[in-house]
Amino acid sequence: MLKKVIGLMSGTSMDGIDAAYLKTDGKRKVELGESITLPFNQNLRQKLTKVISSNFELKALERQLTEAHVDAITHLKNKMITVGDDIDLIGFHGHTILHDPNNKRTLQIGDGKLLAELIGVDVICDFRSNDVLHGGQGAPFAPLYHKVLAANLEKPLTILNLGGVANITWLGDSGKILAFDTGPGNALIDDFMSLRLGKKMDFGGNLAMSGKVDKKILENFLEHPYFSMSAPKSLDRNQFELSPVSKLSDADGVATLSAFTAEAVANSFKLVPKKPKILLVTGGGRHNLALMRELKNRLGVEVQPVENVGWKGDALEAQAFGYLAVRSLLGLSLSLPSTTGVDLPLSGGVLFRASSIKNDYK
């Protein structure tokens, strides 16, 4: 039986909240519905950026973030004319503020109990902690969903998610799968644009396309120990710094950072069993023409946005956590040895049932 689910994702790019409706059995059947993106207001974005604070402030921020997710659900349900209030489950990822799997720590803020109370629907959250506690990298978590979506596509196939951190899912014949973080995605570019020009991003990649890549700095970036590690592996958003490009012009700085993201993806192809013919790109970075150009130049394969195969790039991560919520409810695996490095296929997530929650927050 298919569950009616809303998946919620707040990514490391800090653009806003993605909300997506789907029906799924948590296995091989997925029927996709409406989706929306609700941008963060400036106040919330600034607080998430400066999240290292006292426990009181963190708790207040968690509530503000959760209430923003309630707004996203409301916007999505208003868009869904035929579904009404008939939702079985919500998959609530939350917002990652710490990811340190080597020390078995990962933290996504967002109050699943409060969300279940405010919406009146069962909520599954905290997807990553169990994987990290059992020795996994806790990321990436979308590959099992990618595998279902790509069931009828030619293999081998690679899906690249260009969020704040970039990660790939490699899909081979006979169900083979490999996934890992390749390096920075949009994070360094966005941080550079904010620091230098007060802008959220390099819109369309226009500034990068007017600049020149500093090859020496690019080479130094690629000497980071992360790139010599075997897969699966994962990164924290803030693992790389902007200091190497601090003396470059605005255009050259963002061009060099864009080349770094693309070259890190190119290097990741050395770790996959067989080079794919096509790279499907999802995440906000697919709108960056400079990044897409760099990927095509450095990879030597066809590079396409996921919309070319009928997927919604802005909704994919939210859909994934809706799908994973149903798998969690059924006790099915969310991560595999080949996706996070965990020893055995592992389930996870924490369930809050709306019917059992008292009005502690009123």
Predicted regions and their residues:
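Extreme N-terminal starter segment of soluble prokaryotic enzymes
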Residues: 1-6
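Glycine-rich phosphate-binding/hydrolytic loop that grips phosphoryl groups
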Residues: 10, 14, 259, 307-357
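A contiguous, well-structured pocket-lining segment that forms one wall/lid of small-molecule binding clefts
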Residues: 199-278, 289-296, 300
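Divalent-metal (Mg2+/Mn2+/Ca2+)-assisted nucleotide/phosphate chemistry catalytic cores
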Residues: 87-156
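Glycine-rich nucleotide/cofactor/substrate-binding loop typically near the N-terminus or early
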Residues: 23-81
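Glycine-rich phosphate-binding loop plus the immediately following alpha-helix
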Residues: 17-22, 32-50, 123-151, 158-226
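Short glycine-rich phosphate-binding loop at a beta-alpha junction
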Residues: 84-94, 274-285
